[in-house]
Amino acid sequence: MAAFSEMGVMPEIAQAVEEMDWLLPTDIQAESIPLILGGGDVLMAAETGSGKTGAFSIPVIQIVYETLKDQQEGKKGKTTIKTGASVLNKWQMNPYDRGSAFAIGSDGLCCQSREVKEWHGCRATKGLMKGKHYYEVSCHDQGLCRVGWSTMQASLDLGTDKFGFGFGGTGKKSHNKQFDNYGEEFTMHDTIGCYLDIDKGHVKFSKNGKDLGLAFEIPPHMKNQALFPACVLKNAELKFNFGEEEFKFPPKDGFVALSKAPDGYIVKSQHSGNAQVTQTKFLPNAPKALIVEPSRELAEQTLNNIKQFKKYIDNPKLRELLIIGGVAARDQLSVLENGVDIVVGTPGRLDDLVSTGKLNLSQVRFLVLDEADGLLSQGYSDFINRMHNQIPQVTSDGKRLQVIVCSATLHSFDVKKLSEKIMHFPTWVDLKGEDSVPDTVHHVVVPVNPKTDRLWERLGKSHIRTDDVHAKDNTRPGANSPEMWSEAIKILKGEYAVRAIKEHKMDQAIIFCRTKIDCDNLEQYFIQQGGGPDKKGHQFSCVCLHGDRKPHERKQNLERFKKGDVRFLICTDVAARGIDIHGVPYVINVTLPDEKQNYVHRIGRVGRAERMGLAISLVATEKEKVWYHVCSSRGKGCYNTRLKEDGGCTIWYNEMQLLSEIEEHLNCTISQVEPDIKVPVDEFDGKVTYGQKRAAGGGSYKGHVDILAPTVQGLAALEKEAQTSFLHLGYLPNQLFRTS
């Protein structure tokens, strides 16, 4: 309890955490919880099972509770914002008139865009119709920027249309896409003065107090339009001074600060953000936190954690809701109508409820994207951007929207691009590093070669049912076509999976298949072997986990596997992502994943907590034709076996190429074993029992001790010398004083 309390976690949550036997925070929790409680956006990456869910759930629960408590007691933040219009009452950059990657500090004056490929701009909250006016901009780094003036009609890309005037760091002035030499270049630590004389129709600039001369004459078509301070940035940071602070280089010749302009000269921005500002009145269907998960199982797992963490929170109590598909929407709607504070859900149902107005995002304070790489790989990038655009950037109590992104890897290009677009100066917490295979995992490859192993010819019809990709092809022995070898691979993989289970007498394993139909076919084959879901204790007892199974069945199947009622969990990557299953002794990859990171995710499920684990991958030596649905039904009722490039829904799958990519990614060569799947014992480990802990002090540990022993002895001698020297220095002056 004390360990979590030291990070600022409230006692009620710390008590609940202690009851869960979490005596100390994990590394990811120790790093992330204080950052989130401090109000920052956080990108976090750590292994599955490292406590990521707690790392974001604990601070989210606490801040939601504190927000509700403040509302209950009638407190408001320092910068209460009742409507978007109140933002317009002061001179600042307008949070409702800016590019998607343009960030504005809490003072409204410090601005930044870290997009390196695109320009993102912003205008101020007020403009001017008359008079002579001046403001300053200080450059905080060496990024690219343009500053100046524009009308409400102008593009945010300042100077690229006929309604804006810009001056850029490269020493160019710009108007209507015409870039001409002007003044001189400016960069970090320079201060640019922006002058506007509306009465004469002149625009000019200064650098560090040096007048650069007339830049533009305002054309007649803009004489009756208000001009607003504006800028556009590319990987740059600026700070505006509209006159509230003392100018570094005060203007002369009758120019006055914008903040001192008479009210009659001022025009407020039309972008008041009414649709983007948190409403202060209570809305039952408007949660304070939205947590998006890629699968039902992960969403349920996260919700259960939230229920445990909030166990002792009272007055006000927090109300949570799970929004997932496959469950009657009316039940979810009835809970929404009674009020909800934290929503955990999957994209499909969330999108439905938001688009129909049943779920209101106007009061969301936290947006959490769990397993963001999984969400993006499933094609939910547009959904995430739509959700983010509907959530106000500033809440009713003046707090900024916090975005937390959890990902198995932060090195994904898509995750980086997403973070640049929707996050505000995020802190990266990467405790995962480069992918590697733990010491407790043995992983081997079994080549599936239909040309050398002709077992598939002798099986007749007593083999696993295949996926019907070759239903219209001639796959009979002797055809010697790519289709025949492909069908043979599918048959052999079913046999090899059974052989692996028998050879290693597996009592528990996760079996990964590439598609849902592959999972179903393998389950049916295990039923033919006498096993299946209802055969508790049988050698081939199994359950299936994938997106086409009903939610209740998926939940029940997962629980039965965890309890040990069945030996095997047959699943797809998507269904298994992030599920909290620990210490499984075996994993079988019936097909290698098409994303190399998923290989590490799969085999990382064995050999945890110092328990040895074995991962067996069945890798075809020939190309296999597989389903790759691009149709609108996503495979339901689709029998189009033509190749994708011919308008169909199949591709040729090259597992040998995937294997080489995985080996390159891990910087190792994966051992291959014969089709009899007898795995040779590692010479350092001696006899291995998978699922059991390694022998204490076993392996090559003794060798490490021998190597390090001289260094440790040297350090011990150095420490003794330092301590002795310190004591001599401490007592010697006193002894000298006594003798004198």
UniProtKB/Swiss-Prot annotation:
Residue ranges, annotated region (Necessary for interaction with RELA): 1-525
Record PTM text: Phosphorylated by ATM kinase; phosphorylation is increased in response to ionizing radiation (IR).
Entry GO MF terms: ATP binding; ATP hydrolysis activity; chromatin binding; DNA binding; DNA/RNA helicase activity; exonuclease activity; nuclease activity; poly(A) binding
Cross-link Glycyl lysine isopeptide (Lys-Gly) (interchain with G-Cter in SUMO2): where in chain: K281
Region (Necessary for interaction with HNRNPK): 1-295, 525-740
Record SMART domains: DEXDc, HELICc, SPRY
Catalytic activity: ATP + H2O = ADP + phosphate + H(+)
Motif DEAD box in this chain: 370-373
Key words of the record: Acetylation, Activator, Antiviral defense, ATP-binding, Cytoplasm, DNA-binding, Exonuclease, Helicase, Hydrolase, Immunity, Innate immunity, Isopeptide bond, Mitochondrion, mRNA processing, Nuclease, Nucleotide-binding, Nucleus, Phosphoprotein, RNA-binding, Transcription, Transcription regulation, tRNA processing, Ubl conjugation
Annotated binding of ATP, by residue: A46, E47, T48, G49, S50, G51, K52, T53
Residue ranges of domain Helicase ATP-binding in the record: 2-428
A GO cellular-component term linked to this record: cytoplasm
Chain ranges of the B30.2/SPRY domain: 70-247
Keyword presence, Phosphoprotein: yes
Similarity annotation: Belongs to the DEAD box helicase family. DDX1 subfamily.
Subunit structure, as described in the record: Found in a multi-helicase-TICAM1 complex at least composed of DHX36, DDX1, DDX21 and TICAM1; this complex exists in resting cells with or without poly(I:C) RNA ligand stimulation. Interacts with DHX36. Interacts (via B30.2/SPRY domain) with DDX21 (via N-terminus); this interaction serves as bridges to TICAM1. Interacts with FAM98A (via N- and C-terminus). Interacts with PHF5A (via C-terminus). Interacts with MBNL1. Interacts with CSTF2. Interacts with HNRNPK. Interacts with ATM. Interacts with RELA (via C-terminus). Component of the tRNA-splicing ligase complex. Interacts with PQBP1.
Domain comment (free text): The helicase domain is involved in the stimulation of RELA transcriptional activity.
Protein name: ATP-dependent RNA helicase DDX1
Species for this entry: Pongo abelii (Sumatran orangutan)
Phylogenetic classification of the source organism: Eukaryota, Metazoa, Chordata, Craniata, Vertebrata
